[in-house]
Amino acid sequence: MREIVHLQTGQCGNQIGAAFWQTISGEHGLDSNGVYNGTSELQLERMSVYFNEASGNKYVPRAVLVDLEPGTMDAVRAGPFGQLFRPDNFVFGQSGAGNNWAKGHYTEGAELVDQVLDVVRREAEGCDCLQGFQITHSLGGGTGAGMGTLLISKIREEFPDRMMATFSVVPSPKVSDTVVEPYNATLSVHQLVENSDETFCIDNEALYDICMRTLKLSNPSYGDLNYLVSAVMSGVTTCLRFPGQLNSDLRKLAVNMVPFPRLHFFMVGFAPLTSRGAHSFRAVSVPELTQQMFDPKNMMAASDFRNGRYLTCSAIFRGKVAMKEVEDQMRNVQNKNSSYFVEWIPNNIQTALCAIPPRGLKMSSTFIGNSTSIQELFKRVGEQFTAMFRRKAFLHWYTGEGMDEMEFTEAESNMNDLVSEYQQYQDAGIDEEEEEYEEEAPVDEPLE
């Protein structure tokens, strides 16, 4: 079995993580104590991807929960699914990182990191064939961003050949929690570019928009936002957790989605989007799912793919779906919107099918796109970063923890490089490459 070890760091990561475990426990027929009382054999078949079987028919998530302050952990432990997790897997400090990336990455976080790695090692040893790691965190804070990226690079060192997927909540343009978000995010992206294999970008503002516009919620809570994120996370990992005709795992996903190793930042979407109560009022069809899935309003990152082009994308359908119908729809999308797909990667939509729909739905689809328009997101953070860094605002918080201004400059230029790489592939066409060769061809001049 191909197991995945899940890490959640910081407040945001722990809250999203908790929502994710709640969602997939439900899908696998586990109650809040991890005891199986499901109905279908299929729920058990690949349970071991995310769960360890303990004694007495109890299943325990392969999850490591990390934070630098006890608050969020206590909330998870007191929450509806608090009894699900193994008590030894809660690793927390007391001091907090105070939204300071340097504290999470260099001082406070570094003290805790060995303790976390011990737990990760123990989880990894309990696996038959570890496929990789997934980590949920935000990029705007101190613990999730600073310590999260520290853990990623440490795990990278120890398990260099395993996949590393991150679900990263990027700071959004209008909804901001702290003033130093641009610093934390830029320093984190600098790390993710090098150390992660696939990063699913999620953004609070886009989630708010989906809640307001599509789900008609007048004032969405973080619970509603986390519910959306967990729907996507559950969709991305469906193929790993249930048997299907066309399965993909983290590695296949990466092979199909990442044309150039640095460009692994994906936009995600989910269809059908229904608010938590309103599942049962309408039937959905494959064309409808496809249309909703490719709708920019459905993307969970605040960048509009119509401003860029898709390098690759992947569609994961769940439920009783006809293979042929899916393929026809995908071909249809590509033919009608060919300007939004780069022409130098033929058939760049990958599809996967899984027979088991999410709870309460007949069928659903998850969309993962590697679009060049994700650069908008980095550009936006980069502009805010430059505005503050030019004045050296708030820098003493970071230099006081032993960081150097050089690191900021490096992170900034690495992020700018990323943006221009995306831009370069957005502009690249097929003809340009041929023209270059023509220029280089020797001209047949008569010899003097």
Curated annotation (Swiss-Prot):
Which PROSITE patterns does this UniProt record tie to the protein? TUBULIN, TUBULIN_B_AUTOREG
Binding residue positions for GTP: Q11, E69, S138, G142, T143, G144, N204, N226
GO terms for cellular component = cytoplasm; microtubule
**Principal location listed in the UniProt entry:** cytoplasm
UniProt keyword annotation of NADP present: no
Matches recorded under SMART domains: Tubulin, Tubulin_C
Q: Does the keyword GTP-binding apply?
A: yes
Q: Which CDD domains match?
A: beta_tubulin (cd02187)
Q: Which UniProt keywords apply?
A: Cytoplasm, Cytoskeleton, GTP-binding, Magnesium, Metal-binding, Microtubule, Nucleotide-binding
A Pfam family per the record: Tubulin_C
Its protein name is Tubulin beta chain
This chain is encoded by the gene named TUBB
